[in-house]
């Protein structure tokens, strides 16, 4: 069992990375493997709406998005970490997720999703909501914790002082692991959840 983790911060060893490490350690203690993909330090362009992916099964821009797609398909969970910029998620990680989710046709139903946000002070809950939208449109259950999944600080050293934030990350790791294992057991007994999309309208037509 494996979880793919996205670090949306340009700082590879910053606050977001520190939070994700705490989650990864909790997952490892539950025998769940994790792999981190660093996105925030990459030049990721946004979707241009060309629909190349609809015909070819991959994004027209052959970059980290296409490299990540098969890893996402094989993973049982996806955890996205982002710093908070002006009360929203990092623009680069949003561009990455737009293209990753839109260009991949494989089912994401029952893959566990979770968001981790890092802020110096405020704006974290709206950034948290930004990322969760990707999960809820795809039938992905969202793992929660004992507080909103956030840490506070300006440096990774600051995050070490956020004892409740780190506790929240550990609890999130346990929650993700529990959901993944429970869904696996459910599949053994009940099979895959089928959600056929038979209607697709533009509001009314």
Each model region followed by its residue ranges:
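N-terminal beta1-alpha1 ligand-phosphate binding loop
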Residues: 2-30
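Cofactor-binding loop segments of dinucleotide-utilizing enzymes, especially the Rossmann-like FAD-
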Residues: 6-8, 39, 117-120
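Generic secondary-structure signature for well-ordered alpha-helical cores
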Residues: 25-32, 77, 101-105, 136-140, ...
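A short beta-strand-loop structural module common to alpha/beta enzyme folds
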Residues: 32-42
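Cysteine-cluster motifs in flexible loop/terminal segments that predominantly coordinate metals
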Residues: 42-72, 199-205
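Helix-loop-strand module that forms the ligand-binding subsite of alpha/beta enzymes
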Residues: 55-147
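Glycine-rich phosphate/pyrophosphate-binding loop and the adjoining helix
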Residues: 141-205
């Amino acid at each position: 069992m494996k979880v793919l983790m996205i670090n949306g911060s340009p700082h590879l060893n910053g606050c977001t990375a520190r939070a994700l490490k705490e989650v990864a350690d909790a997952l490892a203690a539950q025998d769940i493997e994790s792999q981190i993909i660093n996105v925030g330090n990459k030049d990721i362009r946004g979707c241009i709406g060309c629909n190349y992916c609809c015909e070819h099964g991959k994004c027209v821009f052959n970059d980290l998005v296409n490299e990540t797609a098969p890893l996402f398909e094989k993973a049982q969970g996806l955890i996205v970490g982002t710093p908070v910029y002006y009360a929203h998620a990092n623009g680069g990680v949003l561009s990455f997720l737009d293209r990753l989710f839109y260009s991949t046709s494989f089912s994401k139903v029952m893959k566990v999703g979770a968001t981790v946000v890092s802020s110096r002070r405020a704006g974290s809950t709206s950034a948290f909501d930004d990322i969760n939208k990707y999960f809820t449109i795809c039938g992905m259950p969202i793992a929660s914790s004992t507080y909103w999944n956030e840490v506070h600080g300006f440096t990774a050293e600051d995050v070490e002082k956020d004892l409740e934030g780190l506790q929240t990350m550990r609890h999130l790791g346990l929650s993700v692991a529990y959901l993944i294992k429970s869904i696996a057991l459910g599949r053994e007994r009940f099979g895959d959840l089928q959600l056929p999309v038979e209607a697709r309208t533009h509001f009314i037509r």
